[in-house]
Amino acid sequence: IIGITGTGGACKSSLTDEIVRRFLLDFSNKSVAIISVDPSRRKTGGALLGDTIRMNSINNERVFMRSMATRQTNASISKDITDAVEILKAAEYDLIIVETSGIGQSGTEIIDIADVSMYIMTPEFGAATQLEKIDMLDYADIVAINKFDKRGAQDALRDVKKQYQRNHNFWDKNPDTMPVFGSIAAQFNDPGTNELYLHLIKIIADKCKLNWKSTLSLRIGNAEKIYIIPPNRTRYLSDITKTNRDYDIWVNEQANIANNLYAIDRLKRLVGENELPNIDNKKLMLHPECQQILE
């Protein structure tokens, strides 16, 4: 049983979908059951139950998904979740995923029913001291920093790895080896999500004593956003329009200088050259190409 929890808006459902998609490709003879919990509103008592909108990989005969409401406020899972999990166990699903609703800093209910727990967060958690308040960093087997394309994501990854090391007293290990991964669930074949999945399968195999081993050939590494227009060219069209505007301004300035020179030259013919001031300085203001055109 994998318990997936995290802050609201961290795209837990999207990341769950990416994990399910890879699992179905990796293990062609195994089945998956997903229970997705949505919060009930205190005012109306209703729940959206809209996590299936994010799931693109569940249209498969090996996948079962059910959305549930918490039926109570200030709770991340339903009181009936234990019975639901027992039913899925009886149905002999190979992998059961329980996704909670969004939690705060103190929500840890998922660890009571899950064999492996995953905490999903975003880089926008505030100051590094806020990490001290997140209970799930004490219990999570694996941590995903989703939306890794956000500004400051690399700093967030470093801070969370150090916090995980402190919380678990892994002082003899390098912080870079902590099970904390950056991911971009909205990006196809994201290398960070690939690495997260491979590590998750390894944790499941170790903790549950299963002979599961991934055979997928996946590109791994830090999550990197794939841009349609490279960041160093994002102002490319703007630069073109600015160049055109600057050229138009320059042309108008040169045209005014040429008009003035023409007027002075005509006046010189009428009243005589000795009656006019020296216009050589005025000619110097005209671009050589423009002088050549006039000549």
Report the location of each language-model feature:
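Short glycine-rich or small-residue beta-strand-to-loop segments that form or flank ligand, phosphate
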Residues: 1-8, 64-69, 143-148, 181-183
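Walker A (P-loop) phosphate-binding motif
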Residues: 1-24
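Residue-level signature of catalytic and energy-coupling elements of molecular machines
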Residues: 3, 38, 81, 99, ...
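Nucleotide-state-sensitive switch-loop elements of NTP-binding domains
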Residues: 19-106, 110, 116-120
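Switch/connector loops and helix/strand junctions flanking conserved nucleotide-binding motifs
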Residues: 41-46, 73-76, 108, 127-128, ...
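Conserved Switch II/interswitch segment of TRAFAC-class P-loop GTPases
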Residues: 73, 94-95, 100-104, 113-131, ...
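Canonical P-loop GTPase G-domain recognition
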Residues: 134-214
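Extended helical scaffolds that flank P-loop GTPase cores
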Residues: 202, 206-295
